[in-house]
Amino acid sequence: MPFIMAICVVLGIIIGTFFSNHFAGNRLNVINSGSNRLNNLLHLIDDQYVDAVNIDSLVDKAIPQILAELDPHSVYISAKDAAAATDDLKGSFSGVGIEFVIRQDTIHVQNVIQNGPAEKAGLLAGDKIVAVDGKPFVGKIVTNQEAMHRLKGPKDTKVKIGVIRYGSKKVQTFTVTRGEIPTKSVTAAYMLDDNTGYIRIKNFGENTYPEMLIALAKLSQQGFKNLCIDLRDNSGGYLTAAVNMANEFLPEKKLILYTQGRKSPRQDYMSDGKGSYKKIPMVVLINEGSASSAEIFAGAMQDNDRATIIGRRSFGKGLVQQQIEFPDHSLIRLTIARYYTPSGRCIQKPYTLGDSGDYEQDLLTRYEHGEFFSQDSIKHTGPAYHTGIGRVVYGGGGITPDIFVPEDTLGMTSYFKEASMSGLILQFAFTYTDDNRPKLNNFKEMMELADYLDKQNLVEQFAVYADKRGLKRRNLLIRKSHKLLDRVLDSRIIYNMLDEQAWTEYINQDDPVIRKTLEVFNNHAAFPKKPAAPAKATKTASKVVKKK
């Protein structure tokens, strides 16, 4: 029973303390009365139920059900899942320093982080992990969650990893001393052309802002005059990271966003004018996977007329969560406020309390309605607002880009879709990488590796591989999808052998969104233009109107 009582106490202290510290004394208290039926019920079950019951397990199941009656983003995270849920945003975690995939119930090391613990111990990309701390680790017990549990651990602790190396059947054992492994938010930064710097950001974590400054300094050394920030498929993260980023590009006293909730008075976030890149022409890329903090940044740039937004309509998450930890290290993320862009719009898409079904299907619904392929399919149901120079923007459903670029469907046949959805493309790419690693290790640059792969007839090799695994060969569809298949296969092998930066550089070469970005910069159109004033009616025109 101590854990049950702890829940009541901790909710009162932690949530109450947070609100008293951050929201001007508006304190949230847990209602503690004789009608606290949930607490009484748990006591009754523990004291009188016919069989012994794990009360902690009941609580783990009850809390998500309670939160499910709220908005779709108020969630419970169990203690065993908490570390994985926060590692990406923390900036680092303690582990061995490998990227891996699980194939045929075995861990395959995909990449070894440079200068990380695993590399220092002697592990190589391509190694198959078959034992951890002297115990076999193969078969059905091998899952992502279990692998993380065994390989992660406190800094400076040791773990023995048994591997089978390519070309050998002998198990070699390496002792790895765990260390801090950085988790990067900025996954690519390079020059698209002689004038245009490009930065891809995958989320907004503790280190996103300093990582971006390092990337900008690198691009400055290369003489960039334009900047493209790619937030496509960026699911968000910490609000403060987005605010700090936006501040770098805005003049003084510009509103970045404000937050407001039932128990939290309005809080404005203003720029201080100390950023170093306030005048550089800029484009921000978004799509339906851009959410939360990514939308905060894009909305601040759009509403302040600071950058041109290119891509497709963003996800539409305009709610702010506070993370609260329980004594057992489980978490809840509770929605405490909404955020509003500088024009006053909340871009949260509609939802129904306690019913997340339609909400979770929203992106599929957009796809089926043709929104990914035609700007005319975007239906604005929220109110209209105006940017600083008078451009119309809309609330209630994500950020609509200034320039729409449809999803590229060239080569998207039923054969390609099945190959992709079945996982066969990823499986083939990894198998090819593993089988040809000695040769592929000779290529250290993306272009060199891409040129080599172009000569290997990978599409034909894939068709044979897929046919043996149940995807029937369809030559006409394969020909129609040849270029797309070749590009995707190349990109996955490049990712396996090099890194995410190399993968990004490769796919951007043939990306219509990147082409549109460069067109905007070449036309000196990155700074939004003030809308033309409506033409004044002539006397003749006014007479015609009256006759109607």
Language model segments and positions:
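Hydrophobic membrane-insertion alpha-helices, especially the h-region
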Residues: 2-20
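Cleft-lining beta-strand/loop regions that shape enzyme active-site pockets
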Residues: 15-34, 38, 42, 46, ...
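Extended, small/polar residue-biased N-terminal targeting/export presequences
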Residues: 49-110, 156-188, 508-518, 524-536
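Structural motif
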Residues: 126-128
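Short, surface-exposed secondary-structure boundary micro-motifs
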Residues: 134-135, 398
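Polar, glycine-rich mid-to-C-terminal structural blocks
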Residues: 293, 305, 312, 316-383
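Conserved functional hotspot residues or short segments at active or partner-binding sites
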Residues: 346-347, 351-548
